């Protein structure tokens, strides 16, 4: 039950989610216990970069988003409309942009596992790219070569570098590319996180 991330290390993680204590407890319980999510958040768990969790009022069609304020400060933000006094409360067949089969989700707690894993995949992808980007001194060809040398696929690199123009992708295109990549390759990762959650909390 404790093979997840070390949430108690404030050098690595900050929680600005205490305004909704039930949601905060759900979130931290999943993070502490889930090794799949720990692997996705390894850059943060090891302290290379910092991750802040928070709540924000958003449009109904947004569950959460992940971004970075600087290269060492990332933010995972959940829609406060869905973090209620009862905890995470969202329609089980709710919002999806990677073609995930949401009929697998049986409870709102499981819906939070799916959302958290989805956002952890984003955080992981951003951290991998930014690590290479900084190692390359922000050069586009050098970033490409570092990612290739580390074994990342052309499809992964295409999220960030437009192979037609050899320029960085726009934020909008990057978002589309990343969701397409997740649609093809990351359903199994979400399944694994969900399965581990069920085994931990059954």
Functional labels for PLM-detected ranges:
Residues 1-110, 125-202:
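Predominantly extracellular/secreted Zn2+-dependent metalloproteases
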Residues 108-121:
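Short alpha-helix carrying the canonical HExxH Zn2+-binding catalytic motif
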